[in-house]
């Protein structure tokens, strides 16, 4: 895969939008756009104990109680069992996000360009990429307390991540290239 310039990327996105307007498959078009996603400006980070996941904190807004983060899920892998405590929105930028229940059964597939909004407090689950790494934007909203609860195999709490933790992670991470 060759790297696109910003102009080439915009041209490709514009061409794809035009193709959809003329009747092409939106799913196929979205996949083509996502294939052009250039990660070279993203400085990926990892957390000890959480395998198959990389992150980049985009923003933490204490006043609005919002944490925006890019997450990259490794292809054909599952991350650790966890639970969402904050309301959140997700937009899939690349690949597909696969969700699994606590027993490991596949429950949902979110394809490229899908957008969902969910309330906090859902059932414990794992997530992972499809046949390629999945890159997703998560916007966590409405709490300055726990956002994610990391769980052990028996559902016991191993760790929590909250607004202050994401603020510290953002301050510690490398600045984007540009």
Walk through the language-model features, giving the residues of each:
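Active-site region of the double-stranded beta-helix
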Residues: 61, 80-83, 87
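Conserved short histidine dyad/triad with adjacent acidic residue
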Residues: 68-83, 120-122
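N-terminal secretory signal peptides and thylakoid transit peptides that target proteins
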Residues: 1-17
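Conserved hydrophobic/aromatic beta-strand scaffold that supports enzyme active sites
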Residues: 55-57, 68-72, 89, 115-117
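Ligand-binding loop in jelly-roll beta-barrel domains
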Residues: 120-146
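Short acidic-glycine-tyrosine-enriched beta hairpin
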Residues: 62, 103-122
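Glycine- and acidic-residue-biased ligand/ion/polar-headgroup-sensing regions
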Residues: 75, 84-103
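A short, N-terminal "cap"/entry segment at the start of jelly-roll beta-barrel domains
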Residues: 22, 26-65, 109, 151-178
């Amino acid at each position: 895969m060759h790297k696109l310039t910003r102009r080439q990327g915009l041209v490709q996105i514009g061409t794809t939008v035009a193709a959809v307007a003329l009747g092409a498959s939106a799913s196929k078009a979205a996949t083509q756009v996502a294939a052009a996603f250039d990660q070279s400006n993203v400085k990926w980070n990892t957390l000890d104990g959480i395998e198959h996941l990389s992150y980049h904190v985009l923003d933490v807004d204490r006043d609005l109680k919002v944490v925006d983060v890019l997450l990259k899920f490794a292809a054909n892998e599952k991350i650790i069992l966890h639970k969402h405590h904050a309301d959140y929105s997700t937009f899939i930028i690349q690949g597909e996000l696969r969700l699994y229940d606590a027993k490991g059964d596949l429950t949902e597939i979110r394809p490229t360009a899908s957008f969902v909004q969910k309330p906090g407090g859902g059932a414990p689950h794992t997530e992972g990429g499809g046949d390629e790494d999945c890159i997703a934007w998560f916007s966590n909203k409405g709490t300055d307390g726990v956002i994610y609860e990391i769980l052990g195999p028996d559902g016991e709490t191993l760790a929590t991540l909250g607004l202050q933790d994401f603020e510290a992670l953002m301050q510690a991470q490398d600045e984007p290239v540009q």
